[in-house]
Design a protein with these regions (language model features):
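Conserved alpha/beta-hydrolase catalytic His-Asp/Glu region
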Residues: 92-127
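Conserved acidic catalytic loop of the alpha/beta-hydrolase fold
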Residues: 15-32
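Short beta-strand/loop motif that positions the catalytic acidic residue
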Residues: 143, 149-151, 155
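Gly/Ala-rich beta-loop-alpha elbow adjacent to hydrolase catalytic centers
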Residues: 35-40, 44
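Flexible "cap/lid" loop of the alpha/beta hydrolase fold
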Residues: 52-87, 126-134
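Active-site nucleophile elbow and catalytic-triad environment of alpha/beta-hydrolase enzymes
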Residues: 121-140, 144-145
Length: 166
């Protein structure tokens, strides 16, 4: 973590991540149950739509293209990544304040600093902005395997209302 953010993380795209998982899944003898959280939930939805899983569970899933939220908590939590003025080529590393609001909002304030020090990691802004791009488009009219969407009522990054829209 002390060496982060690695500038190469700024080059990572959702398409690159999806390509990796497609390769892994196509090499399996049978289709697995896919499980993902946040951006991983969106990845589960995309891979299921492509027929690469037997079923899926998406926990507080990032939204596919066209599913949006204007809820304050969503905008505040995600703005450092999705802001038009944010440099997509630079990885995002949350500040303590951003981490407290976005990730550790359900734990006691006394524990937030240690949670930040243990769990805060940089992320690719390109991946974070991907739900607004065609790579994250899902045709909801196409049949796909069963998908369970789970929403956290206190989640600031992906509010439950956004999961219901999804």
């Amino acid at each position: 973590r002390k060496n982060h953010p690695n500038p190469k993380l700024g080059e990572l795209t959702l398409d690159t991540v999806l390509s990796h998982y497609r390769q892994v899944l196509k090499g399996l003898d049978e289709k697995p149950i896919l499980v993902g959280h946040s951006m991983g939930g969106l990845i589960v939805q995309i891979l299921l739509a492509e027929g690469l899983g037997a079923a899926g569970i998406a926990i507080d899933s990032a939204p596919p293209k066209g599913v949006i939220s204007l809820k304050y908590s969503f905008l505040k939590s995600n703005w450092p990544v999705i802001s038009p003025s944010a440099k997509v080529s630079e990885p995002f590393f949350p500040t303590q304040q951003n981490f407290d609001y976005s990730f550790s909002n359900c734990i006691p304030a006394a524990e937030q600093k240690s949670a930040y020090e243990r769990f805060a990691v940089p992320e690719s802004r390109r991946v974070g902005k991907a739900p607004t791009e065609d790579v994250a488009k899902i045709n909801f009219q196409t049949a796909r395997p069963p998908l369970l969407l789970i929403a956290g009522s206190l989640d600031h990054i992906i509010p439950a209302s956004l999961n219901r829209s999804n």
